[in-house]
Structures are given as structure tokens and as C-alpha cells.
């Protein structure tokens, strides 16, 4: 029977040997070895990394998803199971996620005959790149699935806290880049050039008017500039300028509108400053939108196993590519407290392993509800 010590051991193994997105070959094999040792069958999918497993039988099918990739971060936590791979770390807690889903799979395998349907386990690669879920969704991984359930650990929540809401629970994440091509000149003779920095300054100001003047007060979004660059000396007007940043939004129509307004602004500034502006807009994970009925079941299951359920008033503005699995299937996603002093993606991120105690119980309770 799977014990808490087993789950901790699995988590520490994954933590010690992390692998980056798209290169989770050994991680995939370790997962497969554990599942095979419990006689859990695998489903063939056309992906190089990641895997799908299933237990039970019948028409009903619930999918449980975990991400499996790590981040390009040098760990700064000294412990017996510190990452052995330089500049690679499970700084987002996917080791916690994998161990938890393995615990659910192995525990349910022991009571497989009691299941009124099938449970499919999705070990998904490349979450940190923002598209692993979409790639998996295009395979046979979701065939016959009625609902998809998942979670993410959350450092600012205490152990035993469970945060959820129906509707959007995370934001869509987009990246934008503007490449501004002007004409350089001597700083004393600006009339001989087309200054890209003037356009850059106007662009930065104009982008913020999208939020304050183009969106309804009832449609929230964030536009943040992360990088600005132009030139490399004090007395020369550069030929080019560059700016990039991110957009966070919660509705597809708002997401599309912001992108269109950025194109409109770029065209206007081209005419105003007689320069060229290239916009590269990349949509990464969409917003995770929780199904209303599934959210009710999730809350009930969480309370039943002893979680303190927090009803979120607003979504988190972080990205989560679980949304890529929900384009044609209902699902529910929750945040469970991991009580780390340092946040996700920090080199000193160190979740409290007590988080592993209740997660399997919550998912098993929810699965039985959904298969009833």
C-alpha cells in the first residue's frame, strides 16, 4: 500500500533529477517505472516525453493531470536531495505535483474494482513553455474523457488551505515585442534622422491607454513593460529601439482586442514618426476557466478531507497551461498551500512536504464523486 513516505521519496527523487521542458526523458522513464511496478497500464501517445496511464473500466472517464518539467534555475537550497543538474531546478513544484498524482494512481489501483469508470493520468511535459497541454490535447490522450481535474501548489497559502473559484482562476499570458526601425544620426543633428526613441516613449505611454481608455471598467487586464533598449552611447541617435512585455487578461475577446489595439497603435506611430514598427505578439497559455458544477464538487471534496476552502474573489494573474486541455473539455483547477518562504520560480523556493498528505485524499474523493 502506498504510504506517505513513498510519496515523499518520489518527490525527492524527482527534485534531485530535474529536467527542462521538452527534455523530460529520464523523468518520463522514472514515472513509467513506478506505474509499471504497480501494474498500471500505459496508453501509447505520439509524444517524445510525457505519458498517459489509465486504471478502471467502463464508459465514464475522468482525467487527472500533472506537469513534469523543471526550470532553468540554479538551486540555492542546501538539502540531501538538492538538484544534481546544474542550472535546472524544480522551482515551480512540479516534483510535488508528480509525486501526488502517482500517489493517487497507485492508491486507486489498489481499489480498482470499486471504481465506477476509468481514471486517466496525464503526465504532461513542457508546461513552462506554455504549450505542453495543447500538444497533448491534440493526441489521443483525451479520447472519451468527460472532465479534467488538476492543481498547482501555491507558496503563499498555508498547509491545509485550498483556493478555488468558478470561472477564470488564472489569466491568459501573452508576450509582445516591438522592434522599432528608425534612422540614426548625430545627437546634435536630430533633423537628419528619424529618432526611434521618440517613438519608443510614445509607444510605452500609448500602450497603457489601452487599459485605462479602451477597456470597460468591468474588463480587467494588465500590460507590463519588461525590457526597453536602444543605442549604446550618449551622443548618437540609434537606428533601432526595442521593447517587450506581457499582457495578462481573463477573457478571449479582451485578449484579442488588446492585440488589435497594439497593431493599431504601431501603425499610427509609424506615420507620426516616419519609422517602421514590427509587432511580434505571441499568445501563450489561455486563462484557466473552471466549470461551475465541477467547482462545486471540488469544494465539497476538499472540505470533506479537511481542507480550509478559500473562495477566491479574483483570479490569480499567473499563467497555467492547464487551459490547453480545456478547449473541448470541462475541468476544474485548484491551488493548494505549500507554505514556502520564497515564491514559485525562486532559487530558494522550498515547499513544505506536508502538502503531500491530503492531496491524494482530495483527488480520490473528487474522482469518486464524479464517477458516481
Label each PLM-derived region with a short phrase.
Residues 1-90, 95, 99-102, 106-115:
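Acidic/His- and Gly-rich active-site-bordering loop/insert found
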Residues 15-17, 90, 94-97, 152, ...:
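Histidine-centered active-site/metal-ligand motif
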Residues 63-65, 74, 176, 333-338:
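Non-cysteine beta-strand/loop elements that form the S-adenosyl-L-methionine
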Residues 204-372:
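Metal-dependent amide/peptide-bond hydrolase catalytic core
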Residues 14, 53, 64, 94, ...:
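Divalent metal-coordination and catalytic microenvironments
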Residues 71-73, 79-89, 96, 113-238, ...:
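Histidine/acidic-residue-rich, glycine-tolerant segments that coordinate divalent metal ions
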Residues 99-107, 198-202, 358-365:
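Short amphipathic alpha-helical face segments that pack within enzyme cores
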Amino acid at each position: 500500500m502506498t504510504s506517505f513516505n513513498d510519496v515523499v521519496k518520489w518527490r525527492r527523487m524527482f527534485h534531485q533529477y530535474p529536467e527542462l521542458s521538452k527534455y523530460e526523458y529520464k523523468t518520463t522513464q522514472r514515472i513509467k517505472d513506478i506505474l509499471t511496478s504497480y501494474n498500471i497500464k500505459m496508453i501509447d501517445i505520439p509524444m517524445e516525453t510525457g505519458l498517459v496511464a489509465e486504471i478502471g473500466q467502463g464508459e465514464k472517464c475522468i482525467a487527472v493531470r500533472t506537469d513534469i518539467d523543471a526550470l532553468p534555475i540554479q538551486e540555492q537550497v542546501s538539502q540531501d536531495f538538492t538538484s544534481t543538474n546544474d542550472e535546472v531546478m524544480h522551482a515551480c513544484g512540479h516534483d510535488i505535483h508528480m509525486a501526488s498524482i502517482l500517489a493517487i494512481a497507485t492508491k486507486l489501483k489498489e481499489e480498482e474494482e470499486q471504481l465506477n469508470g476509468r481514471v486517466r493520468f496525464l503526465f504532461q511535459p513542457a508546461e513552462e513553455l506554455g504549450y505542453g497541454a495543447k500538444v497533448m490535447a491534440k493526441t489521443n490522450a483525451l479520447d472519451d474523457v468527460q472532465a479534467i481535474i488538476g492543481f498547482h501548489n501555491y507558496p503563499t497559502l498555508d498547509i491545509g488551505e485550498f483556493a478555488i473559484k468558478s470561472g477564470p482562476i488564472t489569466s491568459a499570458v501573452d508576450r509582445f515585442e516591438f522592434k522599432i526601425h528608425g534612422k540614426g544620426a548625430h545627437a546634435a543633428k536630430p533633423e537628419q534622422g528619424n529618432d526611434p526613441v521618440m517613438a519608443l516613449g510614445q509607444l510605452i505611454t500609448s500602450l497603457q491607454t489601452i487599459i485605462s481608455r479602451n477597456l470597460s471598467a468591468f474588463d480587467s487586464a494588465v500590460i507590463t513593460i519588461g525590457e526597453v533598449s536602444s543605442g549604446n552611447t550618449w551622443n548618437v541617435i540609434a537606428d533601432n529601439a526595442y521593447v517587450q512585455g506581457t499582457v495578462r487578461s481573463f477573457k478571449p475577446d479582451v485578449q484579442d482586442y488588446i492585440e488589435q489595439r497594439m497593431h493599431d497603435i504601431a501603425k499610427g506611430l509609424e506615420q507620426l514618426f516616419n519609422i517602421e514598427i514590427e509587432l511580434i505578439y505571441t499568445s501563450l497559455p489561455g486563462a484557466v476557466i473552471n466549470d461551475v458544477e465541477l467547482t462545486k464538487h471540488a469544494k465539497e471534496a476538499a472540505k470533506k478531507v479537511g481542507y480550509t476552502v478559500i473562495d477566491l474573489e479574483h483570479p490569480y494573474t499567473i499563467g497555467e497551461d492547464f487551459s490547453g486541455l480545456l478547449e473541448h473539455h470541462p475541468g476544474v483547477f485548484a491551488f493548494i498551500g505549500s507554505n514556502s518562504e520564497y515564491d514559485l520560480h525562486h532559487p530558494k523556493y522550498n515547499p513544505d512536504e506536508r502538502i503531500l498528505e491530503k492531496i491524494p485524499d482530495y483527488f480520490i474523493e473528487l474522482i469518486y464523486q464524479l464517477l458516481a
